[in-house]
Amino acid sequence: MIDKSLLTGSTTMLLLKLLEEKDMYGYMMIEELAKKSDDTFSLKAGTLYPLLHAMEEKGFVTSYEASSNGRQRKYYSITKKGKGHLKEKKQEWKQYSSAVNKVLKGGTAFAY
């Protein structure tokens, strides 16, 4: 099991990455994140929705109502600002993980 503190800060990046692929509603994001991470990332609705609201306030995502299988759902879509933020965070993550791997392996950082 992965220490939850390791996930802090990366959740926004992961959600933006999902939304870069397609617009999604909350439960769909929870399911997709779990699936793509082999159940390593399991978000609860009580964690997800405050993050989505904060991302919307920052202009990283927008939301809209649409019908899915006869049910009204709130979909989220990444904005241009959100794509820029995602690009920055991905670069920061590469630098961070490379530095961690360098220390753990006792040698030079490896390229991805």
Predicted features along the sequence, with ranges:
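N-terminal helix-turn-helix DNA-binding core of bacterial DNA-binding proteins
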Residues: 2-47
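Short, contiguous hydrophobic alpha-helices characteristic of membrane insertion segments
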Residues: 4, 60, 110-112
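A cross-family signal for key residues in well-ordered alpha-helices
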Residues: 14-17, 31, 53, 87, ...
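Conserved anionic group-binding/transfer micro-motifs
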Residues: 29, 48, 82, 93
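Basic amphipathic alpha-helical segments that dock to polyanions
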Residues: 48-55
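Beta-hairpin "wing" of winged helix-turn-helix
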Residues: 56-72, 77
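Basic, amphipathic "hinge/linker" alpha-helix immediately C-terminal to the N-terminal HTH DNA-binding motif
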Residues: 71-90
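Amphipathic alpha-helical dimerization/coiled-coil segments
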Residues: 84-112
